């Protein structure tokens, strides 16, 4: 599928281009982007403070609607077409993108602008849980 995507070269520019998005894998979903949060790391990539690969697609705090479900996820109750999902770690500065199983969570169909950042932050917190003997 051809879709638009946006990336930066690290020279304070944003490039819009077309992308041949691959089909989602068997444990992936395809997401139609509704909103994407702009993270501090996205700003650092834009300004050049954080080195990026050439044409690296940015965006990792997305919210969208599921448009396709991989065969391994169909019928599992995890997610279905039409569900709202919050995603993390995916190149969500695009009209459509794929999200791997484990990188998305189903969210209620409410006004998306109120949920994307809290969900993304919550996921990041869960992934960086303080362990025994950590200094705080």
Regions found by a protein language model. Give the residues of each.
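Extracellular beta-rich ligand/substrate-recognition surface
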Residues: 6-14
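Short beta-strand-to-turn element immediately C-terminal to the catalytic PLP-Schiff-base lysine
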Residues: 8, 46, 67-69, 98-101, ...
